[in-house]
Amino acid sequence: MADNEILQMHDLKPAPGAKKDRTRVGRGEGSKGKTSGRGAKGQTKRNHVRPGFEGGQLPLYMRLPKLRGFKNPFKVEFQVINIARLVELFPEGGEVAVADLIAKGAVRDNAPVKVLGDGETTVAFTLKGVKASASAKSKIEAAGGSVSED
């Protein structure tokens, strides 16, 4: 095509090397004939082996023990927060609800909250809407606070 001619649709063609024919195997000795790239004799020449087959050796999935039991789909996973963390977040004490803990970024709103007894407190907390361990409850009540689960 000369430089001064206008390029037209019928003049377009793929770039050199852009289109490559796929290799047709088993069509003569000149190009991937006979064994067609599968190597010499044997199991993989004739057919394929299924996933997990180890050549007759006892396979891994049969060597390992069966898993026992089941996963309870209704198990309630609590988000835990310790008394020491409560004292950090609310040094003045007072009434603390789950919404306050979410606002401070201590817990998320996708699971219930449980307070554990790690740490000491001298300020009185009034916890609402949370569960508490026995040790946490006794420490909070000793400091003059209270815990309600509703």
Swiss-Prot record:
<dbReference type="InterPro" id="IPR021131">
    <property type="entry name" value="Ribosomal_uL15/eL18"/>
</dbReference>
<comment type="subunit">
    <text>Part of the 50S ribosomal subunit.</text>
</comment>
<dbReference type="GO" id="GO:0022625">
    <property type="term" value="C:cytosolic large ribosomal subunit"/>
</dbReference>
<dbReference type="GO" id="GO:0006412">
    <property type="term" value="P:translation"/>
</dbReference>
<dbReference type="GO" id="GO:0019843">
    <property type="term" value="F:rRNA binding"/>
</dbReference>
<keyword id="KW-0694">RNA-binding</keyword>
<protein>
    <recommendedName>
        <fullName>Large ribosomal subunit protein uL15</fullName>
    </recommendedName>
</protein>
<dbReference type="InterPro" id="IPR030878">
    <property type="entry name" value="Ribosomal_uL15"/>
</dbReference>
<dbReference type="InterPro" id="IPR005749">
    <property type="entry name" value="Ribosomal_uL15_bac-type"/>
</dbReference>
<keyword id="KW-0699">rRNA-binding</keyword>
<dbReference type="GO" id="GO:0003735">
    <property type="term" value="F:structural constituent of ribosome"/>
</dbReference>
<keyword id="KW-0689">Ribosomal protein</keyword>
<dbReference type="InterPro" id="IPR036227">
    <property type="entry name" value="Ribosomal_uL15/eL18_sf"/>
</dbReference>
<feature type="compositionally biased region" description="Basic and acidic residues">
    <location>
        <begin position="8"/>
        <end position="32"/>
    </location>
</feature>
<dbReference type="Pfam" id="PF00828">
    <property type="entry name" value="Ribosomal_L27A"/>
</dbReference>
<comment type="function">
    <text>Binds to the 23S rRNA.</text>
</comment>
<feature type="region of interest" description="Disordered">
    <location>
        <begin position="1"/>
        <end position="55"/>
    </location>
</feature>
<comment type="similarity">
    <text>Belongs to the universal ribosomal protein uL15 family.</text>
</comment>
<keyword id="KW-0687">Ribonucleoprotein</keyword>
